[in-house]
């Protein structure tokens, strides 16, 4: 699963695409961990833009749980942004929104971690 990223001040927006399931969870976890490492080194928060994710399985939720634990042990912050309706429902039903903050838009997520990052996002 490809992970693109873009930095906005003290935040890095990471944008996966496709399905987060058993078939690609291992690679996603490895790549997301590398992104978390970079955020830790930069002192940046990680915003996981889920707008390109069509589906999340239980294996995908496990990957997100591991990422949340990694962020906590590294004194980093990770938030979820812009999930599609089906993914938002999965996160809510599984109560995963209690593990990681979930925001309706990428801008809202950026504003929650850094007002300066939200301003940089607004400037494009």
Question: Where do the language-model regions lie?
Answer:
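Short, flexible active-site loops
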Residues: 13-15, 48, 121
